Amino acid sequence: VGLHYQIHRGIGVHHAEALKRGQSLPVNIFVGGPPAFTVAAVMPLPEGLSELRFAGLLGGCRAAVHYSRRLPLPVLAEADFCISGHILPHLKPEGPFGDHVGYYSLKHDFPVLQVEAVHHRTGAIWPYTAVGRPPQEDTVFGDFIHELTGALVPQVFQGVREVHAVDAAGVHPLLLALGSERYTPYEAQRRPRELLTAALHMLGTTQTALAKYVLVAAHEDAPGLRARDVVAFFRHLLERTDFERDLHFITRSTTDTLDYTGFALNEGSKLIWASAGEKRRELALEVHDLPSLPEGFGDARCAGPGILVLRGPRHELGRNETDPRMEELAACLAHWPQRDAFPLVVVADDAAFCAADFDNFLWVAFSRSDPAADVYGTGAVVRARHWSCEGPLLLDARIKPFHAPALEEDPVVQRRVDALAAPGGPLHGLIE
């Protein structure tokens, strides 16, 4: 069977060691069992902390294991199924399949597991979860992880008070964080200094290292602000951003395996957007006096305070190609009287859908763009390797030819599930 394992999940470390020794890596895949097993499997644990130990800690007792002379690894006694085998030295194409970001992952070569045994309990149940654009069933895991790890955040990331990997954006594409800005308390104007150190720390360890857009605000500027209040967070950030100072790109970096917006598989860019200080601008909720836009752009809509969404022409360029039409749009907006009131402009294929609600905006804007390739700006320049602009900031969130296709629900299956949840159905009251 194909062994699709994503980067920064830990198994690659063990696989690399086995290859170094010239050995095939033994693998046990456990399915089902107590809920603590499932939570431990998706928990972003530090390297060296066993999922078995964490499952025991979470479940309140040691996880029972069974040792067999026929298997090199122990078997979880309470698991419903155990698939045992070794990783073969060659690769095979795997995919496509639906993912939790809301797309069909494309076909790629991955390691192959030679299955040698399958064990199961009496009356075993094979659990599964439906995937697709969030929120889905696995959203509750993300909420639970935030609840479990919230108190640990300041200990793991010095100077960080709160983080929120935004589920509506697909989790890894967007990370919001509140931090402290204490490096130079004697300065008259607060500016992001400690926040940048904290952002780089978050991109250097744990699962936050896979974040694509890292938006960081200073707790001192708004003590009541919370990272989980996404609309308020964006408003706070857009009111304070200095576009000549606050955007920091990391190019050709490591990205999540499921993100197809970047340079290649597992490779793309990141953007640290860190703002601190006093409010700079008033944001608008209504669009006025928009200049005549370049051909193909239109249907202006407001997605939130200071966020303008435009329909754009179909994207037909290749990876990492600068779109002259986006640069033309940026130049056009330089003459817009409301340019400061709408500091963020998102270009999408369907402006009405993107602006219909804030979750739509988050999903489209951050799951369909790569910072280095898709961020433009009015008056953009590069000085001393630092990209800046006068504003507004433009984000090209159109679907590109090399993107994974969006996951679409099968209406026949959807009706069957709805029937199960209807009054009198076996799942009535359990699902909505």
Label the predicted regions.
Residues V1-G32:
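Internal mixed beta-strand/loop scaffold within catalytic domains of large alpha/beta enzymes
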Residues G33-E432:
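Charged, compositionally biased interaction regions
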